[in-house]
């Protein structure tokens, strides 16, 4: 409560003896002798009580309680490579007491994911850019490079085609109809992993 006095005709009245009323203004609804705590616009009125037969008077002051501002939540790293293990992106500025989160807070497989962060109390809190809009944080898991061993020691006969040369499981010739010639020649092949969702297909391998 403010300190001071109201002077009337050279007399004084202690602030502690005054009646105090807080009222909301504009769109703020409030009417109490107790000071408000929520964001809004108010007036506080000090009034000499009717029981005081020596003095009369009132004094009003307008004031505003602004919304507390919070840093927006961000994701420290938003792109991960598939590992086979569960991935949980690390956030920055998240406050469990003041914010809610929902969505894809963890994932294992390759894909695009999103987390939504919202303010629990939008009447009293806002982001530092003065907005209260829910935040959508996007993150992703990308394909990993599969382990594979390039086959060696393959032989065939002149006039045959590449398709006649058998490759290990997962490998295919890029141009299987190619006619073979004499000599040591490298040909392009592709390795396709069993899990094509989480692992890259490797093209243009020299064999």
Q: Predicted segment positions?
A:
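Solvent-exposed beta-strand/loop surfaces, strongest in extracytoplasmic domains of secreted
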Residues: 1-207
């Amino acid at each position: 409560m403010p300190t001071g006095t109201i002077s009337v005709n050279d007399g004084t009245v202690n602030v502690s003896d005054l009646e105090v009323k807080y009222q909301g203004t504009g769109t703020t609804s409030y009417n109490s002798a107790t000071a408000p705590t929520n964001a809004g616009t108010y007036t506080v009125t000090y009034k000499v009580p009717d029981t005081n037969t020596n003095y009369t008077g009132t004094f009003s002051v307008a004031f505003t309680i602004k919304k507390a501002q919070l840093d927006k939540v961000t994701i420290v790293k938003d792109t991960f490579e598939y590992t086979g293990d569960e991935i949980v992106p690390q956030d920055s500025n998240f406050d469990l007491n003041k914010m809610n989160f929902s969505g894809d807070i963890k994932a294992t497989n390759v894909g695009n994911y999103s987390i939504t962060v919202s303010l629990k109390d939008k009447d009293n809190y806002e982001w530092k850019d003065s907005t209260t809009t829910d935040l959508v944080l996007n993150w992703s898991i990308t394909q990993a490079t599969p382990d594979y061993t390039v086959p060696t020691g393959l032989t065939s006969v002149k006039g045959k085609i590449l398709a006649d040369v058998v490759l290990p499981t997962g490998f295919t010739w890029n141009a299987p109809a190619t006619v073979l010639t004499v000599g040591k020649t490298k040909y392009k092949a592709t390795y396709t992993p069993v899990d094509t969702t989480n692992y890259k297909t490797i093209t243009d391998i020299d064999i």
